[in-house]
Amino acid sequence: MKPIHKSAKLSNVLYDVRGPIVDAAKQMEDEGQKIIKLNIGNMAPFGFDAPEEVQQDMIRNLPNSAGYSDSKGIFAARKAVMHYTQQLGIAGVTLDDIYLGNGASELIVMATNALLDDGDELLVPSPDYPLWTAATSLSGGKPVHYECREDDGWMPDLADMRAKIGPRTRGIVVINPNNPTGALYSTELLKGIVQIAR
């Protein structure tokens, strides 16, 4: 059988939460250490279940879930998101602006594919949720990391962010609350990022 070789597009893609970290954890388990696996964000094994109301809504709507929804997502869910943005005082968000997906992973890949041409840059926090860097590379873009230093509570360094914007910058990734650091950004900091983006 002819060997199958991976695409050269993967040469700059790292996704440690499914590779080296898992391998190191397996080795530690083999050595008798107890490992709590939080690498992929699956909290259900640790008792973080969906609220009862959500579970009941899922059960009640199961008969309606045997087919595809609208390509932008379920209407009622999109409408709930729109109402939430209105409650926050965010003007101008319509149903046509809201797209839902099967978790963040699908939407991250869709967003980078839709946004980036070959060679375009996307500012990504460091440390980052690794799918952003991987998806940016796979989309033909270049991830440019801005600093979020531990000695500053993992907050984004706005001066560093501003300095890294160039002619090929297409966007700034903001993960709030941050994954993997858990940092929660203030409204003032977020407004500062918006000013840089403008």
Description of each model-found segment:
Residues 114-136:
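Conserved PLP-anchoring active-site segment centered on the Schiff-base-forming lysine
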Residues 138-144:
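A short helix-loop-beta submotif of the ANL/AMP-binding
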Residues 92-98, 118-121, 168:
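Short acidic capping loops at alpha-helix termini that bridge into adjacent secondary structure
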Residues 11-103, 110:
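N-terminal small-domain helix-loop-helix segment of the aminotransferase-like
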